[in-house]
Amino acid sequence: TIDKLVASFSGLGKGEPLELLALLYLSYAGTCRKENVEPRPPDRFWEWGKMLLSDFNQIDNQLAPAQDILQYMAEEKRIGSWHLDLGSSQGKLQSGYLAFYNLLWPLYQDFRQRLIHENIAYTGLAGRIACERLPRLLQENAIPRQTFYLFAGFNALTGAEKQLIKTLVREKKAEIIWNADRYYLDDDMQEAGHFLRQYKQDPDLNHFF
């Protein structure tokens, strides 16, 4: 499967949800100490932690610029709190949220390094690391010369999956067989063919249609 391929390129195993949450809390508590912020206890962090993992996973899955996104989220929260009286109960609550959002980028960095040290990852991080490592693996001939990959049955890819496939295609080490129904592909009004129509415009992928 493509998940196994991503794991082989990234060198990271798949972390279990509870394990990832526990490691995320360690990164959170450590980041709080560095930033002189009082950390929430684990039981109050747990739900936030689940949402954070989901957000980090989406960012990495799409190879989105994590620093830009997370710092923008903090800035948006800061602007939204301008009108509040920070001495009021609502203001104090909002101030706590703002402190948390200001931690997101350093927390993401610490968590990433912690997971790499532990040789595990969530799906999105494994994909991002695989994309970062693949060019070097190819340059160093770490992938046997006779190895060839055939990707079949896809009609939508994450940003990381797309980048991996494009890199392998450019090196003539892969082909792709799309799960493409002409009815959905040729009709711009058919939402089911949205991603396939995008791939058809991609110079690395269009000759497989």
Which positions does each model-derived feature cover?
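Nucleic acid-machinery interaction/catalytic patches
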Residues: 1-209
